Design a protein with these regions (language model features):
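PLP-dependent class I/II
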Residues: 6-8, 16-27, 32-48, 79-372
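Extreme N-terminal starter segment of soluble prokaryotic enzymes
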Residues: 1-2
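A glycine-/small-polar-enriched, mobile loop at the entrance of the PLP active site in fold-type I
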Residues: 27-35, 48-67
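Conserved N-terminal alpha-helix of the aminotransferase class I/II PLP-enzyme fold
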Residues: 57-90
Length: 372
């Protein structure tokens, strides 16, 4: 067995979700998956594409028409690019895997600001590289120059930025991004931007892809899953310098060949479907959850995007995993321990649930902590 795989850790998110599902009557606030169905025009486009016979191999990079549509989408959002800068992938997970595997050599290092989505560490480990963690809790979840510079070494190959962030919902400030840009140029490493929540953020998100001087070192990962409620479709993309895309394509060709053709046709339609209505629902749910947490006396970093809140539970005198196990067993509610993200002392709550589910779940949380 590959030693790198033996060093990989199972997903704590999946583990606590499975525990909740095996517990009768347990509610869940664990999953970061839109509760909406994929918009009908997208589903109809997929059915039409199959009926039209678009069921054969697609090019390894993706169809020209989808890559051109994605390039136009990114250009409209501020990242000027052409289809030569785009690779269609199997979701953002595929994009992250291809990008990190494509740039890393064994023994090199990737800086991961934490709390962070645990997948980043898993991919880095599988590639035979090392994760170097930059804890943002003491800096109000922003990146400070001295702290970042302290973890940069000659082995540093990349930094992963996820803004809005999973699990906190926090957005990196322009000052944080300026710091990353300056040090990436000084020390010559890539900036991997996981932007899967940007389209659903409540406020405008500062973005390094707008900085022309960084175009040769910024790699953007994006997904159809979150903005268009297409998690099961497994569609995403990479945007990067053309020479990197060419190399990434060789890697993807060896892994999956290509993304299904009829799904790519439906993805073209998705790019034309507004996400403003779903974003408005998420904002409403966010404000409701925050108001309830305020009433419970729980503090949290202010989320400005994504669909998570990361309340502090350290005052209850137990670690986050113990808290979440007891919450399931005694409170009938599942959350994800902050330790799964490198954020001990917190839990992650998702508001990708109906108003009724949120109300009942937060009632359960309130009853649980009132009895501690």
């Amino acid at each position: 067995m590959n030693r790198n795989i033996l060093n990989m850790k199972p997903s704590g998110i999946r583990r606590f979700t499975a525990l909740a599902r095996s517990t009768p009557g347990c509610n869940m606030l664990t999953i970061g998956e839109p509760d909406f169905d994929t918009p009908e025009p997208i589903r109809e486009a997929a059915a039409s594409a199959m009926a039209d016979g678009l069921t054969h191999y697609a090019p390894n990079k993706g169809t020209d028409s989808l890559r051109a549509a994605i390039a136009a989408y990114e250009t409209n959002r501020g990242m000027a690019c052409t289809m030569d800068n785009i690779l269609v992938t199997v979701g953002a997970t595929g994009a992250l895997n291809t990008a990190l595997t494509g740039i890393l050599n064994p023994g090199e290092e990737v800086i991961i600001p934490i709390p962070a989505f645990p997948l980043y560490e898993s991919i880095v480990t599988a590639a035979g590289a090392s994760s170097v963690f930059l804890d943002l809790k003491k800096s109000n979840f922003q990146i400070e120059k001295a702290a970042l510079e302290a973890v940069i070494t000659p082995k540093t190959r990349a930094i992963v930025l996820n803004s809005p962030n999973n699990p906190t919902g926090c957005v990196l400030s322009r000052e944080s991004l300026k710091t990353v840009a300056e040090l990436a140029e000084k020390h010559d490493f890539y900036i991997l931007c996981d932007n899967v929540y940007a389209a659903l953020s409540a406020e405008a998100v500062p973005d390094l892809t707008l900085c022309r001087s960084l175009r040769d070192r910024v790699i953007l990962c994006q997904s159809f899953s979150k903005p268009w409620a297409m998690t099961g479709w497994r569609l995403g993309w990479l945007a990067a310098p053309a020479e990197l895309i060419d190399k990434f394509t060789l890697l993807q060709a060896a892994q999956i060949a290509s993304v299904p053709t009829f799904l790519q046709k439906a993805a073209e339609t998705a790019l034309e479907v507004p996400v403003t209505d779903m974003a408005a629902v998420y904002r409403k749910r966010r404000e409701y959850m925050l108001s309830r947490l305020d009433q419970m006396g729980l503090t949290y970093p202010r989320p400005e995007g994504a669909f998570y809140v990361f309340p502090d539970i350290s005052r209850f005198g137990m670690d986050s995993e113990t808290f979440c196990i007891r919450l399931i067993e005694e409170g009938g509610l599942a959350a994800v321990p902050g330790s799964c993200f490198g954020g001990e002392g917190h839990i992650r709550l998702s508001y990708c649930y109906s108003d009724e589910e949120l109300r009942e779940s937060l009632d359960r949380l309130e009853r649980f902590i009132s009895n501690l």
